[in-house]
Amino acid sequence: MSEVSKKSGDVTVTELTEDGKLVRKIRSFVRREGRLTKGQESAMDNNWSTMGIDFAQQMLDWKEVYNREAPIVLEIGFGMGASLVEMAKHAPEKDFIGIEVHSPGVGACLMGAEETGLTNLRVMCHDAVEVFDYMIPDGSLETVQLFFPDPWHKTRHHKRRIVQPAFAEMLRKKLKIGGTFHMATDWENYAEHMVEVMNAAPGYKNTATDGDYIARPDDRPLTKFEARGHRLGHGVWDMKYTRTE
């Protein structure tokens, strides 16, 4: 059973067992409301019917979504969407779907997709974990991307980090055998946490050949934020795991 409680404008669903014990659920985000610019709002109005997917408790049919069969790349938390649009532009042979809860980011992504004339990109504005639970067919994803998620750097907040054992198992089921989970972070402590979780997760193999990390792949665009970090001497850690079973 569940109880719904409202807190700071957000809705939290608390799952309970039959004897009243709390079941901690994974959460992929902390909601951040924001105001859309006129351009973002216009992009939402003009493009949602063709590029937006509404949340529903029903599995997606990728062939129906994209009107073709192609490898599916899913990104969790794409921010303002610039990198996702860039990746979709340079890989027209693949189909991309981005999930983001920040509506201005979704609007900005649709603006970029419209300006670029993309037909291989879809977006959702919802909690990624619920989307995975209810809408993503098992064994259907070629790649899952998680770039620069909230590091929750305070020790007492580490339990809020999205990369946890249950999350790794959920993703494993949705990836194809041989599919990849690509992560990137600019927090070394979070990178270490990611490696610790993923190295222990069954059914995955770290693709790094020397140590735990890989060089930034050419297909992951260098963001302005990341380039600035490089100039200031800040590190970025990329990790890629394949589903083996």
Curated annotation (Swiss-Prot):
NCBIfam families: tRNA (guanosine(46)-N7)-methyltransferase TrmB. It is an enzyme of class 2 (transferase). It comes from Photobacterium profundum (strain SS9). Its EC number is 2.1.1.33. Keywords: Methyltransferase, S-adenosyl-L-methionine, Transferase, tRNA processing. The keyword Methyltransferase applies. It comes from the Bacteria. The gene is trmB. The active site is at 150. GO terms for molecular function: tRNA (guanine(46)-N7)-methyltransferase activity. Belongs to the class I-like SAM-binding methyltransferase superfamily. TrmB family. Substrate binds at residues 154, 186, 223-226. Catalyzes the formation of N(7)-methylguanine at position 46 (m7G46) in tRNA. GO terms for cellular component: tRNA methyltransferase complex. The keyword rRNA processing does not apply. It catalyses: guanosine(46) in tRNA + S-adenosyl-L-methionine = N(7)-methylguanosine(46) in tRNA + S-adenosyl-L-homocysteine. Pathway: tRNA modification; N(7)-methylguanine-tRNA biosynthesis. The lineage of its organism: Bacteria, Pseudomonadati, Pseudomonadota, Gammaproteobacteria, Vibrionales. This is tRNA (guanine-N(7)-)-methyltransferase. S-adenosyl-L-methionine binds at residues 75, 100, 127, 150. InterPro entries: SAM-dependent_MTases_sf (IPR029063), tRNA_(Gua-N-7)_MeTrfase_Trmb (IPR003358), tRNA_methyltr_TrmB_bact (IPR055361).
